[in-house]
Amino acid sequence: MSNSLISDRKINCSRQAELELLKAYPILFMIIIHVYENLSVGRIDPTPRTYLEHVLQFLAGPATAPAYMFAMGVGIIYSGNNAPKLLFRRGLRLFLGGYALNAARSGILTALGTALTGRFDPELTKYLFLNMDILHFAGLALMMSSLLFGIKIKPLTIVGVSLILQLIGRRLAMLPEMTSDFSYIAGHFYKCSPAGCFPLMQWYIYPAFGILFGTVLQRVSDLKAWYRQLGL
């Protein structure tokens, strides 16, 4: 890649339309897949059974979560509120908002189910309320980034940190699966139970690369030429 395309000063500081689309697409498909899984008449198997399910699972899975997290990393750089303290507060609000969402989408249905059937499943209720999803991860990722920014870690080093975290997380995930309540806490950081979908150690690599990409993108003098060199 030609260094002539990279300036030593920031040029592209306004939000980029292509990256806004990159954020919008995952949100759309995450909404679609969650509505489909929760409101489908048929039983949803882990393995897709139909062509439609294959398409939905791919577009809302491997092609969505990493793209959203990468775009989030770019957004951190382009945000006017990325000072460490502000970033940490935003992350904390998102993290707590994840549990508020759990309560909102599960609490009413759990209460109705208990009232109608007279049966109460404490383990299922605990899972529904404490399950970690992408909103919790986003909050943790922002708080993690705020700590790294606070100690003046450079973007390339942040990527290195994320690689180390992923290696550690993968090793920890090889330990026997937890069944205790502690798994709901540990699951925020590495995959140790079904309750944690996006543990920080194994997924932070995507926003980390987004942070690096956004830092470079702000200094690109010719975006079209640069994207061409990237094969995009």
Where are these regions (language model features)?
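Alpha-helical transmembrane segments and their immediate juxtamembrane cytosolic regions
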Residues: 1-232
